[in-house]
A protein has these predicted regions:
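N-terminal beta1-alpha1 ligand-phosphate binding loop
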Residues: 2-26
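Residue-level recognition of beta-strand->loop/alpha-helix junctions
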Residues: 7-8, 36, 88
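FMN-binding flavodoxin-like domain, especially the glycine-rich phosphate-binding loop
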Residues: 18, 26, 30, 47-169
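A short beta-strand-loop structural module common to alpha/beta enzyme folds
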Residues: 30-41
Length: 169
């Protein structure tokens, strides 16, 4: 059984799914399994020791609609002993006042925030405001494929290595 569940909201061929697949590739398919939250439930979450949760911005910085439905399942899951890492996609140029706010909303809705790892630097981004920023850091990996696609792969690689250490794998 794999130890890490990667859960994403959105289309199976969308940007969030592509990031989830890259994360899985870096961790190894023997370590991580991908789930679309649209097709997942509490039992899927409960079978993993570690969780990686990903969302795209939806509307103006909102959490993807699939997450709105799944968040209740997640809240009912046994999260007390699980380490959790988050990632989110956004557009800092078109929506600088709500950059990766879906990521921030996901973090805010989670119980056991103390179990969240994988915080990242806000340096190299240009935005006005983000609910995903806490104490000068993002609550997870922030991806802007619209304006900084050339940085996406290295950001994912560095973040996965950080999360691997914080998960103690």
């Amino acid at each position: 059984m794999t130890r890490i569940g990667i859960f994403f909201g959105g289309k199976d061929n969308g940007g969030t799914a592509k990031v989830a697949k890259k994360i899985q590739e870096l961790l190894g398919k023997d370590m991580a399994t991908i789930h679309n939250v649209e097709k997942s439930g509490t039992d899927d979450v409960n079978k993993y020791e570690f969780l990686i949760l990903g969302t795209a911005a939806w509307g103006i910085g909102e959490m993807h609609s699939d997450w709105e439905n799944f968040i209740e399942e997640l809240i009912e899951a046994d999260l007390a002993s699980k380490k959790i890492a988050l990632f989110g996609l956004g557009d800092q140029v078109t929506y600088p006042e709500s950059f990766v706010d879906g990521l921030g909303t996901l973090f805010c809705r989670l119980p056991f925030k103390q179990n969240v790892v994988g915080f990242t630097s806000v340096d190299s981004y240009k935005y006005y405001y983000s609910t995903a920023e806490k104490d000068g850091r993002f609550v997870g990996l922030a991806i802007d494929n619209d304006n900084q696609s050339e940085l996406t792969e290295s950001r994912i690689i560095n973040w996965v290595e950080q999360v691997r250490k914080e998960f103690k794998l």
